[in-house]
Amino acid sequence: MLIRGLDMADIFDEVSEELKQDKLIQTWKKYSKIIITLILLIIISLVSYQSYLIWKKNKIEEISEQYFEALEKLENKNYSKSQSLFLKNAQNHKNGYKMLSLFGLAESNYQNGKIDEMIMNYKAIYDDESIGIYYRDLSRILSVLKDNLSSFDQQKLLLQPILNSPSKLQILAAELEILLFIKFKKIKEAEKALNILLDRSDISFEQKNRLELINRIYKNNVF
């Protein structure tokens, strides 16, 4: 009886296993197309993503090469060529190289004597809120520093957002403001701004030396 019981148990196990297999086969037949489609979609997605990463890497390398080629032309004083390359990079890309290319484009135009174009290049940087505030402030300072066309009010207005904020470049902007006063022969304003800046405890040793030198020069000649 024990043997028969074991045989019956084995038979039930076999039948149960066969039923499971039949059910699995039926399920596979019913859903195989959907399952295969899902697997293919996953594979296609993975391949597409990897292809995108490879494309992106190659694109970044291409952009990088274009930027450094433009930079080399700028360093070699081939300003027309550097202007063309920087302009292409600035127009076609939206990553960090666009911002760097705008700085390079501004410098190329400045060296070519195209001050109006230079001003617009820097404006494109400081008007773009997606760019970090440090670089936007830096573009304002460089624009004022190199601008020999705009009025005093226009240049002073450009510096004002830096002067009124806790920017890392605030002290440098304050120093540039003094030079702006002197440039436009606003001597009393220059002297007042110079004394205020010299009294600040957060100016660097190098900047203090520069300011004291300016103070001595203009005190002996103008102030």
Residue ranges and their predicted role:
Residues 67-100:
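Short extracytoplasmic
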Residues 96, 102-103, 110-223:
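Soluble extracytoplasmic domains of inner/organellar membrane proteins
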Residues 57-64, 80-83, 153, 172:
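Amphipathic alpha-helical repeat elements characteristic of tetratricopeptide repeat
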Residues 2-43:
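N-terminal positive-inside, membrane-proximal cytosolic segments immediately preceding the first
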Residues 44-68:
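Transmembrane signal-anchor/signal-peptide helices with a preference for the extracytoplasmic
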